[in-house]
């Protein structure tokens, strides 16, 4: 069986001493025994008439490229001589898949729905000739689909540098759009390799050094009729950088991109995952999400994103390497496709409250459906990506909370969030175990300002000790300062403090307005000024700022006041604590008329000075006239000791609650770090209120 289109093949035919020679041709040679006629591209592959001595059959193949048609004719010749009939040959040829990594098309995980998606093809083309052939093979299909042809390509490091500009020129000349990215840079700088490629291109190309992001950007930015060629790596399942190989497969990233584009969403929790979602199998210090694939499948998950395939699970899996890093890359790529007015919120204290205030303002401005905000405190390297992945083209404004407890974390989060406005709310004594000094905290939170665009706006308190540092980090970008000084861009005066809130006049560059804030404490008024400054920075009218602040209500665990049946207040500030936030909360408690009790749990992550810090807040409670201090846990006991008479330390929650009940009626403030779980005290008090109410109602009915 010989190729009649090849000059050497024709010579073999003429010289062959075989009893029977079968010639095949894609050029329609009448002398050939097996021919491809009426060869043309379709939307999903090639169509041609397979002509043999037995007759003709129409063939649709997902293989692309004329060379693959020739390969099919060769196979047809072999099968024919083995005695297969034409209809059987046609069925088999139509079902053949490409060799891995050679013009191999990629499909999404099947979700049972029909979606119009671009065609994605992976090819190993890493030489000029191979790249030219691959693009040429796909051009006719792009034309048949009435779409564009996009090429994502790069060149390997430590290899022939002369071919780089040549390949760049081929891609620019033959494809409609090109994204230049990394291949296997090996020991070379990827940016230098990209520069070499760009030298052969007539115009400056689109560059995305992260290959995963380049693939996501290409697939998500394409029209359904488009064809995308991912060239260079083909079937490879790794990427080599500086001598280290990490798991990377173009086909897996393209599969995820297509599956996401079908409308799939992500979940990291098998307890809450829903049908059709993708389970991201994160690996932590205690649990490995890869061990929970069967649970995800039982909940109806469509597939799992894993670091490496778990063959024991039947759940479809997409292998993206380190899943935590994959989540960050996915979120960064998704964020780059959306352009809402985005505000990032950092700081030691008040982040979540200020974020909720801003969210209330944004809702007043553009409505619920057009605004996005961080849910709860999902502010780490899992929560921030999940929040960004909720972005849609309908969102006009967003506020994202960025949290940290180690150096370098804000850099990671700000890099994917890419805000237009960034707030540093304050710098206080938090995470001292890892950051050691308040200045280190100020620098870490302030690092968000470096990720603002040149047109971005930095927002921070003008009277903070580190205001000059934040101005320096802002570089030449515009700055908005807030606080109680009349020289600041956003400030307040005519302040009237009430037990459950504050009223004041707020001054902004837009003008002045009366504001009623339904949250107690001067620190919450500061948060409101920060929110107003951020909102002004993204263009929110003053009337919407006022409406949004008026509509704000404290969230559970964050200075959330609620009335007790005895007429006193329970202030739930149990979400978190550091020395400065405890002092601010004590100030609020001290302003209330009547007996007051502080219930304090341990303050976590405050470093070697923990004992002194707890003693400090205990002494401050005494100084401010708080009537009693009850503490829970060994660390918090230092606060009770410093408080003196009226300070009681407990290690048992039930004993503390009984003592608290015995000392009521009184205003009660409950505060502590997450690790102290002081919300248990709040729940116990609420349960007690409910029990007392039921008893009263029962006595009334008996009477």
Kindly label every feature range from the protein language model:
Residues 1, 36, 71, 75, ...:
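Residue-level signal for inorganic ion chemistry
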Residues 2-4, 10-17, 52, 73, ...:
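Phosphate-binding loop of NTP-binding sites
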Residues 5-7, 126-127, 155-158, 184-185, ...:
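Short glycine-rich anion-binding loops that position phosphate/pyrophosphate groups of nucleotides
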Residues 7-8, 32-37, 64, 84, ...:
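N-terminal leader/targeting and accessory segments in enzymes
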Residues 7-56, 95, 99-110, 390-430, ...:
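Extended acidic/charged loop-beta regions that coordinate divalent cations
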Residues 18-42, 60-66, 90-95, 104, ...:
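Beta-strand->loop->alpha-helix junctions that form or flank phosphate-binding loops
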Residues 43, 53-177, 199, 264, ...:
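Nucleotide phosphate-binding/pyrophosphate-handling subdomain across enzymes
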Residues 117, 167-224, 304-314, 574, ...:
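C-terminal helical cap/extension that packs against the catalytic core
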